[in-house]
Amino acid sequence: MSTPRFDFLILNGPNLGHLGKRQPEIYGATGLDAVPGQVQTLMGDAAGDIQLDFFQANSEGALIDRLEQAYEARTDGVVFNAGAYTHTSLALADCLAWVKLPCVEVHISNIWARSEPLRHQSYIGRHAVGVIAGFGIMSYALAVQALYHHINNA
């Protein structure tokens, strides 16, 4: 097996530490542990080019710290589900603006189909190369694939 060429951070915000168990009617019954296998199925041999590093925090400061660490480590890209901070955090948006890491915003549910109007806005998306939402846990694998293609075609 070859050495991965790309390091991607899979960053998850508040209340996303129990995916697969938390509100399965909204977020599905599959957890993040399924993502590497989904990436392999979706991308085939190209999946071997990617190292995935998963991090979840319930606090805004810890997410900012991890983004800054990714910047310092020259991480190649970020798949970011900021959870509720998507709709409220100027601090995370400001961090993404300065670290300038290629980022795909990801959501398990379709935030624009949710009933709460606040969930229809994103401070994260304006600093992302793209947004993937509404495909359950598969949204993460789709985001990894999109980020990989974005970086390879930049």
Tell where the protein language model's regions lie, with residue ranges:
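Extreme N-terminal starter segment of soluble prokaryotic enzymes
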Residues: P4-F8
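Short glycine-rich anion-binding loops that position phosphate/pyrophosphate groups of nucleotides
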Residues: P14-L16, G83-T86, S109-I111
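Helix-adjacent hinge/juxtasegments
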Residues: A46-D94
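Active-site histidine-anchored catalytic micro-motif
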Residues: S89-A91, W98, G134
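Short, acidic/small-residue loops that bind anionic groups at enzyme active sites
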Residues: L96-R114
